[in-house]
Amino acid sequence: MNIEIMTHQGVQVAEVTGEAKSLKGTEAVHDLIGEVAFNHRVPRVLASRELVDESLFDLRSGFAGELAQKIANYRMKLAVVGDFNFVESLALKAFIHESNLGNTVRFLKDREKALDWLVQP
């Protein structure tokens, strides 16, 4: 994975890029959060949905909840950008809906809207 620091409306955002499904498992998430939070010291993260292995969207894996908790613990914001129409699980749809009401993690289709949300205080 690559992390590029960009500026949007005067605020730094870490954009994560890489191979599809390169975020596999909680260890990869811990590494990513550590890299962004401690090495780059940027609390706002933009990532493509394609980076996340689809199996991790299974709520039974605990990945989604752990990701949200880690982001909250480190006082970060994460926007995951992409198409979430593949989601069939009512529980996951509810998780995404609830996340999108909060100020920690959002799942958005539009990159510009994601960036605009990330830079809000």
Map each language-model feature to its residues.
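Amphipathic, Lys/Arg-enriched alpha-helical "gate/interface" segment within cytosolic domains
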Residues: 2-121
